[in-house]
Amino acid sequence: MMKKLLLFVMITGIISTAHAQIENPVTWTYTAKKIKGDVYELHMTAALEGKWHIYSQDAGDGPVPTSFEFAKNPLVKPDGKVTEVGKLDKEYDPNFKSTLRFYTGKVDFVQRIKLKSPVNTLVKGKITYMVCNDKKCLPPRDVDFSIKINPKS
């Protein structure tokens, strides 16, 4: 009987640990929108669960800001920097001893690009971000993305 109880406790602990390690309150979606001619907007949208928030690219001192790294693509030229569309919150955080900038609910990160040739291509890259709620922060996370550009459609 004790062996079964011990086994049950161990399995429950392993499952709880595994669940905690894969906690991910962010869902990312990726789309391309043709603006005009050879100009497109890449939309990398973060939807956050509950009271979780994601930090701005200019987060403040302390947390890891959201950042974007685009893979080289000879068919694509970036046009400016990634912009943020959403309700930006600013709040002093005594843990970081800094005023932090973040988004709750949803934020759309937008990168304009120019297509050098009217052919289908993929824009690939990596997003690094960190999320927190009022109780804890999760470690920074990297997410790879791939966005289809189809100028003929």
Predicted features by range, described:
Residues 4-14:
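Sec-dependent N-terminal signal peptides
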Residues 19-153:
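Extracellular/lumen-exposed scaffold segments
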